Amino acid sequence: MAALEAERERLVLRRFSYEDAWQLGILVRELAVERAAPVVIDVRHGARQVFRCALPGSSADNDAWIDRKRRVAERYAAPSFLVGARFRAKGTTFEDASRLDPNSYAAHGGSYPVSVEGVGIVGTVTVSGLPQAEDHALVVEALTRWVNPRAHQGG
């Protein structure tokens, strides 16, 4: 869990405009296409959906998962994967202990709050279609590249 907390601290953006949200969505899509990942991608600036894409092999169920995971990231101001891990670390589950409707909230990996330096959380990026750890990893890879693009140039 410490690694998830540290990851959260380093994935802070300098800014996040509507154009940034769109370009981040494109980056997530490019990474997903490279892997032939059957995912749905959702990027929000505040409450506004700026980017949404469904790739081959994904389903309408993934759309529902996007919404449920995003609600957790928004409510807890933390990645949905981390929220689930926090509950498990206490010896319980999100479903048993959160008192939130599991039809509306899911603490499964794949939704990440977008945080801006000196501002706080300004949006979310969410992926659904892979096992939860892989959904989370895809979002983290995209955010890592976004925060430090030079580290990923040239292979």
Label the model's feature ranges.
Residues 1-59:
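Intrinsically disordered, low-complexity terminal regulatory regions
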Residues 18-22, 88-96, 148-154:
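Short, positively charged
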Residues 36-100:
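Structured interaction and signal-relay segments at domain junctions
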